[in-house]
Amino acid sequence: MAAWNKSTFIEKAKDSCYPHISNILIDLVNFADDCADIISWGKGRECGTMVYKCKSDDFGMVPLFHLTTKGQIKFQLNYMRSNVPKKEIVRDFQLKLESNFLMDFDEEEYPSDLFHEVDELFNIKHEVEKFEDTIQGISARLKQ
């Protein structure tokens, strides 16, 4: 396979994951398709990847989250800490992630961006929608 795209990603997610997990992935892929400035698709053979990116005049292309067809998500918080000098935007993203997922994302507890199992973070549709609102809000702040 040369590169992944929306349809191959969704197909692989449906084949690889339980239905409730693939439904979350599909919701997030559709959200990215509607709202991301750029979606970056991976080139791996076994596992598909998708990265939601926001175009900022001040900071260039900023990845906000990363999905895999194995049912995992990575929040690009530490990438933002290193590449977005406006600490209030990074802090806002951190606080919203902590509020959404009841996890600690400070620099000491979360020193590098890690993959999390989607089904451990999202249990109901409202949680997915709340995360989507967070991403839209951070995207808007990056574009100011």
Q: Which role fits each region the language model picked out?
A:
Residues 98-144:
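Charge-biased C-terminal accessory regions appended to nucleic-acid-, cytoskeletal NTPase
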Residues 1-116:
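Polyanion-binding interface signature
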